[in-house]
Amino acid sequence: MSEPLPPKEGEPRPQKEESQNDTLEATESKSQHITGLKLGLVVASVTFVAFLMLLDMSIIVTAIPHITSEFHSLNDVGWYGSAYLLANCALQPLAGKLYTLLGLKYTFFAFLCIFELGSVLCGAARSSTMLIVGRAVAGMGGSGLVNGALTILSTAAPKHKQPVLIGVMMGLSQIAIVCGPLLGGAFTQHATWRWCFYINLPIGAVAAFLLLVITIPDRISSTDSELSTDKPMANIKSTLRKLDLVGFVVFAAFATMISLALEWGGSTYTWRSSVIIGLFCGGGFALIAFVLWERHVGDAVAMIPGSVAGKRQVWCSCLFMGFFSGSLLVFSYYLPIYFQAVKDVSPTLSGVYMLPGILGQVIMAMVSGFAIGKTGYYLPWALGSAVLVAIGAGLVSTFQPHTSTVKWVMYQFIAGFGRGCGMQTPIIAIQSTLSPEQGALGISLAVFGQTFGGSLFLDFANLVFGSGLRTGLSKYAPTVDTQAVTAAGATGFRDVVSKNNLPGVVKAYSLAVDHTFYLAVGATACTFVFAFGMGWRKIATKNDTRAVPETDA
């Protein structure tokens, strides 16, 4: 059957197409995109902030032993990470709601200030309790930074430039995952662990200055609102009502209970303990209550409207982000263990050894972003990303104590190449699906999926690694004290193991790391499945400012 011919000149267009074009043209006409040097400064500032966020999450890892020694707080170790995570996850949807109601630039600035305040509290902490409070405050501020940065890019840049700019931001900021432990170790060894937090202040100040001197356009609401973008607090009562604070409290309860269950399960409490079971059950009930409440208040007020979360492209993108983040963090946390424990290199050199994956990721993030902006299609890159990362993770899972340099360089590069292909595709899918005023909500959900999914897979990887290490020690070094080896850590076990038992312990460590990458392969396989749900959609390109409707065929 032939396609219908386009209308001749002078004939009216079909009503549906006309309304779509009018909406897009109206949005474009109201948007005041920035270009040139100003756009470059905006990209630099939000990249600084995203880098800062990932640096803060990774830099504390090498400082924790010294912190626990100073505060005599070994029992509080779990809270140094979970306090940040709990606050960050619980506030993600609320942060997205704030970006839809209040001015984009100053809301982002407020979150940055809260994050910096948390860093000051951590750096100045005189007790373990003060440090935990500071981590929670930093998590509150961090809940609005990555999603705010992505929202700023999607508002400030023309549609055809957004893929490459998002790729640049996400690709470069991921370097912080490698730099964090290196800087943390350097500060702890040569200065003080407090600089692990104070380093956030100058970087954040540079980003804040760049944003304050540049005018960033706000999103345009498609309907008349009780709130004014120019005067966001003109009606405080209406603002509070639209924030859906009841929904926030219920969602925060869900996120807190599930996060605590994952944090404590297998370490503080056994998985079968009443505490862990109670937390999972309570989190499940809170989630059900949240869904019912959101349906009750309706999309106009709901913190996570059904019209946003219910779209297949949105929830598939969020799940893609969660599994993608899980795979990425397995690489980031367990490759250094392989290099330091198995290859016996220093923390600094292990960071250098991870450069092939990082370079492949950064290069391909920019290349794929440019290609998506030119062609308008993001789904092939998401699918290609899943395939390449799965292959790379599978190859890395074959690492042995004597794996050659050529192999560990090339295998990392393949995985990094794949990560760079797909890391920005969920954000692009969400932006192409939702209206401009709903974009911040969708991005917040994706960032929540990224944070929550990454945390979940790190917990799973920790269980897999611990189990694999104990099994390997009993098989390859049955005479060693397993508890002493695990207590000594990945860099200290050589001091407590005899020369005869050392090869067996190294072999056990190598196999335990390999097992964690089976988990990365599984996570990446899930991204391949959910990528199809992100939709075959052609986004606007430089020569075509109209998005092509999705085809489900």
UniProtKB/Swiss-Prot annotation:
Applied biotechnology: Compactin (also known as mevastatin or ML-236B) and the intermediary metabolites Ml-236C and ML-236A are inhibitors of HMG-CoA reductase involved in cholesterogenesis. Their hypocholesterolemic activity might be useful for lowering cholesterol levels in the blood and reduce artherosclerosis and coronary heart disease.
Positions annotated as glycosylated: N21, N543
Subcellular localization(s) per the UniProt record: Membrane
Its membrane topology: Multi-pass membrane protein
Main location: membrane
Spans through the membrane: 41-61, 77-96, 101-121, 136-156, 164-184, 196-216, 245-265, 273-293, 319-339, 352-372, 376-396, 440-460, 516-536
Keywords: Glycoprotein, Membrane, Transmembrane, Transmembrane helix
InterPro entries reported in the protein's UniProt record: MFS, MFS_dom, MFS_trans_sf
Biased composition annotated in UniProt, kind: Basic and acidic residues: 1-19
Entry superkingdom: Eukaryota
Residues covered by region (Disordered): 1-29
GO molecular function, one term: transmembrane transporter activity
GO cellular component, one term: plasma membrane
PANTHER family: MAJOR FACILITATOR SUPERFAMILY, MULTIDRUG TRANSPORTER, PUTATIVE (AFU_ORTHOLOGUE AFUA_8G00940)-RELATED
Record's function text: Efflux pump; part of the gene cluster that mediates the biosynthesis of compactin, also known as mevastatin or ML-236B, and which acts as a potent competitive inhibitor of HMG-CoA reductase.
Protein family (similarity comment): Belongs to the major facilitator superfamily. TCR/Tet family.
Protein name: Efflux pump mlcE
Organism per entry: Penicillium citrinum
Gene (name only): mlcE
